[in-house]
Amino acid sequence: EALLNLKQYKEMMEDIDAVLAQNPEEETAMLLRGKVKESNGQGEEAEEDYKLVTEINPFNEQAYLYLGQLYINQKKLTEAIGLFDEAIELNPNFAEAYKERGRAKLLNGDKDGSVEDMKKSLELNPKEEAGLNGEFKNLGPKSEALPGIF
């Protein structure tokens, strides 16, 4: 993701801060603030926001997803997989959590587990196949990268 320019960043943060001033436990605003911080290279601050949402509402599967995605980028693959497990436990039909867990498993060397998760993701969201085509382009022909899916 491209870094936000300084003006955009300041405007977004002002808007988010205004919402949080009215309701300090507004989960969506905290998640958005985390995403803005993450896209601006502030991973530790983003992590704090995502974790805070899981403390306020341990049933917010989106917070576990975002934190897991951040951990993939930080190469904390085992931790990421655990967070995706949590998101899936909260919402067994959460296709994006299966996809991201599959990506983390693949990066962690668990090709079979990755294939299983990707199949489940496609079962839940068949429109995602085009997105998966690009996801694994660096792994060689998709039939070799993830046999059994394509």
Annotate each PLM feature.
Residues 5, 32, 66, 100, ...:
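Canonical tetratricopeptide repeat
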Residues 107, 112-150:
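Terminal, low-structured helical/coil segments at or just beyond the last alpha-helical repeat
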